């Protein structure tokens, strides 16, 4: 039995194409280990000690890893990775391409990721953030994260110095 063809199929096809490739950003699950090189390139734009493609490939193959990517016009603009254990998760990294920063896209990415974590039974989320990263601190506070501790000398800086990390937690229930 064949399915009837809508008289609007050209429009429906165009709208589906536009949604996938148009300028409107969207968030989608990140599951493909073959995206590891793209993740490594984006990560290198944000961190003094970036992770390599093999590290990302290994993480994406782990069952405990949860990830989402932010896409716009067919290109990955950012991503977030977490590791889930029982009813808790740790955000491992959040990255936006330099061209995507400052427009509220990190809020959208984090909101959708936290919503997904809540749906799969995560009650509490933890993370570490550089104490000097004011935009990230503002973003996390907006999403209910509170400071619970510090780790002195945790992050390596480009100049060889070490920066303090703030440990933060948010309850999703």
Task: Name what the model sees in each region.
Residues 2-8, 65, 124, 130, ...:
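Conserved catalytic core of the tyrosine transesterase superfamily
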Residues 8, 13-103, 107-120, 169-173:
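Acetyl-CoA-dependent GNAT
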Residues 58, 132, 155:
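Positions that flank functional sites
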Residues 86, 104, 108, 131, ...:
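Residues at secondary-structure transition points
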Residues 97-111, 118-120, 124-125, 130-138, ...:
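Conserved glycine-rich acetyl-CoA-binding loop
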Residues 128, 146-162:
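Conserved catalytic-core motifs of GNAT/GCN5-like acyltransferases
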């Amino acid at each position: 039995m064949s399915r009837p063809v809508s008289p609007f199929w050209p429009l429906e096809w165009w709208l589906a194409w536009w949604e996938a490739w148009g300028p409107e950003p969207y968030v989608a699950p990140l599951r493909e280990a073959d995206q590891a090189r793209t993740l490594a390139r984006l990560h290198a734009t944000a961190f003094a000690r970036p992770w390599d493609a093999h590290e990302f490939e290994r993480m994406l193959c782990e069952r405990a890893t949860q990830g989402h990517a932010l896409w716009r016009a067919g290109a990955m603009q950012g991503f977030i990775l977490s590791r889930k254990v029982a009813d808790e998760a740790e955000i491992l990294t959040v990255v936006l391409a330099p061209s995507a920063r400052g427009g509220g896209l990190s809020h959208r990415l984090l909101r959708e990721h936290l919503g997904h974590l809540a749906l799969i039974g995560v009650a509490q989320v933890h993370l570490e953030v550089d104490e000097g990263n004011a935009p990230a601190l503002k973003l996390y506070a907006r999403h209910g994260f509170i400071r619970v501790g510090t780790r002195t000398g945790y992050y390596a800086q480009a100049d060889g110095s070490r920066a303090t990390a703030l440990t933060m937690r948010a309850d999703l229930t």
